[in-house]
UniProtKB/Swiss-Prot annotation:
Enzyme class, first EC level, given as a word: hydrolase
Pathway recorded for this protein: Carbohydrate biosynthesis; gluconeogenesis
Protein name: Fructose-1,6-bisphosphatase class 3
Catalyzed reaction equations: beta-D-fructose 1,6-bisphosphate + H2O = beta-D-fructose 6-phosphate + phosphate
Sequence similarity: Belongs to the FBPase class 3 family.
Highest taxon of the lineage: Bacteria
EC nos: 3.1.3.11
Gene Ontology process terms (BP): gluconeogenesis
Record's keyword terms, sorted: Carbohydrate metabolism, Hydrolase, Manganese
Length: 668
């Protein structure tokens, strides 16, 4: 406790106004003292487990399972608690029951001959496991995690030892009564959910919830129910956020990507976006065009020829609209320095060629029915009407707006948390490895100041509805964050979408990465970034996503001698043949850092019926000799400040600077 005497009493007097407010919450020496004791005890608890996941790309089945099994944490807890006293098949079944209690119980009820015995054994096991996973938390925190229906019973069972002679009958009778009154199934579901909740104290999603997968909206719905989460926006998230804000270029990009991968379920079923006007438009303008280069890329999708033809026409129609809308932004914002992406005016329709960087290329598709040679970036009347309808659909989708507000409320471009720096893409660098200076709004920025400014502009794009000029600039910046040359989310010099559709020469398809990726193995670069973000280089890590780790080719996700960790989740099935695995996740618990690599997930159905889990292997990156405590974390720093304030309040009471409330008044 800080000792205050006559020499430093002025500190308390300077803070007297604040301390009087604090005294409303702690109106006596007794209440302030109790809170200090409580907070001091919390500081000495083990730090909670953090779970890091990145690049989900809409693959909701794999993600849902990863969330439920906490990247193998639950299985490790089962091993720790039961060791060799349980067969491997029993451990597997117990784990599956915790992941999917409702579905697994339905199967067990059909197959188990002596259900009462099974209930009794399972309840004892679940309670024992829950006692272990809850042991690092205060009773108050555990109590808040319990479902109201069973809160009292679970709390009693967690705080009683079934092997204590004086309480054994009491403990056993609770379990027997649960079974006798036919509430065992509901209790198993409740305690399984409590275990799932308590094994992970904090969830970090390092970008790209959205993309080509079929269930981004399912993922966000699940995340919105999570007890403690933060999100670092990815490039695919930002383009959806821009679309929800009303940025027309972002809307066109979102629709184009969905059509490219024949994934319309998120748009149509998830968010109720009406694509019929686009289908009508595409059939009118591209009726005789087979749109060969716009056929959707499909994995595990059975589409008939009619569907493919329609999707191809819609895909081409929205792509041309996208290039026009992007051209308007590039012309409106010369500070973006993206003039080389103005390609529509470089097309020679008569010759069927494109002048790209003073070199002539043959176009593989020369049908541009909506292109005006004199004004190639102008939308025709039908296109303008279509864009307005699509924009209204995005702006008026209640579910989309709710989900995007969730991303804003819980997300940011980067996060400093417990000495780790989390961001999705990169910190823009020059070729020599120094921080890249970027001019925005007449300010020249780099590193942390650049990301802080971009974060503010992204919020203005959505929330500045009464300031049209600021909102428009923010929306243009959202598009820049998606594909701009100095975007920390994109991390490349240019996005060659047009070239991939219209040119055969593969050299024109290349997208040069920011020099950041060249220096990822350089400890000096990491140290420079830590200093820029005011972190201790000796005790910090950069946790990064965005670029899949090509494990098959021998690439290591651990960079710069462990200073930088790449955990692209690898959920996207299209990348798995290139990477050789289904990506990496990270666990940071009180014992250290564990990097887990995962094999591809089969399906939730197989996980429930056959007990198939994601096959994972874990690498211990750092192991501490003494467990990290809450006092070693960011939360610990906040608690220390609270304790300091309460200590000042105690002195203020004892010196008579603030009067205690009458005990009778406090009680009544």
């Amino acid at each position: 406790m800080t000792l205050y005497d006559e020499n430093n009493l002025h500190i308390i007097k300077d803070n007297l106004r604040y301390l009087k407010l604090l005294s409303k919450q702690y109106p006596s020496i007794s209440s302030a003292s109790s809170e200090i004791i409580n907070l001091q005890a919390i500081l000495n608890l083990p730090k909670g487990t953090e779970h890091f996941i990145s690049d989900v790309h809409g693959e909701y089945e794999s993600f849902t399972h990863m969330l439920k099994n906490a990247s193998g944490v639950i299985k490790r807890k089962i091993d720790d608690v039961f060791g060799t006293s349980l067969r491997e098949c029993d451990k597997k079944n117990l784990a599956t029951l915790i992941y999917y209690p409702e579905q697994k119980l339905d199967l067990i009820k059909k197959s188990e001959k002596n259900l009462e015995d099974w209930y009794k054994i399972t309840l004892y096991r679940l309670i024992r496991l829950c006692q272990i996973v809850s042991s690092k938390y205060t009773r108050s925190k555990v109590r808040k995690s319990l479902p109201s229906d069973f809160a009292y019973i679970i709390e009693e069972l967690l705080n009683e030892q079934g092997d204590r002679v004086d309480k054994q009958e009491y403990y056993n009778s609770i379990i027997e009564t649960i079974i006798d009154i036919d509430r065992a199934s509901e209790f198993i579901i409740a305690i399984s959910n409590v275990i799932q909740r308590l094994v992970v104290d904090k969830l970090h999603i390092i970008g790209d919830i959205y993309d080509r997968g079929p269930g981004a909206e399912i993922i966000i719905e699940a995340l919105s129910k999570h007890h403690s989460i933060d999100i670092q926006w990815g490039n695919h998230d930002i383009v959806w956020m821009g679309a929800a804000a009303g940025c027309e270029a972002c809307i066109a990009n979102v629709i184009r990507i969905s059509l490219r991968y024949a994934n319309l379920s998120t748009l149509e079923d998830g968010y109720g976006i009406n694509l019929l006007p686009l289908a009508t438009f595409a059939m009118d303008f591209y009726k005789e065009d087979n749109c060969e280069n716009f056929k959707p890329r499909t994995i595990d999708k059975n589409l008939n020829e009619t569907d493919i033809k329609l999707l191809s026409k819609m895909h081409k129609a929205i792509s041309i609209i996208q290039f026009k809308l992007e051209g308007k932004i590039i012309k409106r914002r010369p500070e973006f320095k993206m003039e080389e992406r103005l390609l529509l005016d470089k097309i020679n329709i008569k010759e069927g060629t494109l002048n790209l960087n003073e070199k002539i290329y043959k176009l593989i598709d020369t049908n541009f029915p909506t292109l005006d040679k004199e004004n190639p970036y102008e939308l025709n009347e039908r296109e303008r009407d279509l864009v307005e309808k699509l924009t209204n659909s995005f702006i008026n989708s209640e579910k989309l707006q709710r989900h995007i507000k969730f991303l804003y409320s819980n997300g940011s471009l980067y996060l400093k948390y417990n000495s780790n720096l989390l961001y999705h893409g990169c910190i823009p660098l020059n070729e020599d490895g120094s921080l890249k200076e970027v001019t925005l709004c007449k300010e020249t920025l780099k590193g942390k100041s650049l990301l802080d400014k971009l974060d503010r502009l992204a919020r203005e794009a959505y929330f500045f509805k009464k300031d049209p000029e600021s909102k428009l600039y923010g929306m243009d910046m959202m598009w820049y964050l998606w594909c701009g040359p100095n975007s920390p989310l994109f991390g490349k010099k240019k996005m060659t979408t047009f070239e991939r559709y219209f040119l055969d020469d593969k050299n024109t398809h290349k997208e040069q990465k920011n020099p950041y990726y060249k220096y990822r193995n350089d400890e000096k670069m990491c140290t420079m970034i830590f200093e820029e973000f005011e972190l201790d280089a000796d005790n910090s890590h950069i946790i990064n996503g965005h670029i899949p780790v090509k494990t098959k080719e021998g690439e290591n996700p651990i960079k710069a001698n462990g200073k930088l960790l790449v955990i692209d989740g690898g959920f996207c099935k299209a990348y798995q043949p290139q990477t050789g695995i289904a990506g990496y996740t990270l666990i940071y618990n009180s014992y250290g850092l564990l990097l887990t690599s995962h094999e591809p997930f089969s399906s939730i159905h197989k996980a429930i019926v056959e007990g198939n889990d994601i096959l994972s292997s874990t690498t211990i990156l750092e192991h501490v000799s003494s467990r990290k405590r809450v006092l070693d974390t960011d939360s610990g720093e906040e608690i220390k400040k609270q304790i300091h304030d309460l200590e000042m309040l105690l002195v203020a009471y004892r010196k008579g600077l603030i009067k205690e409330e009458n005990e009778a008044n406090i009680r009544f």
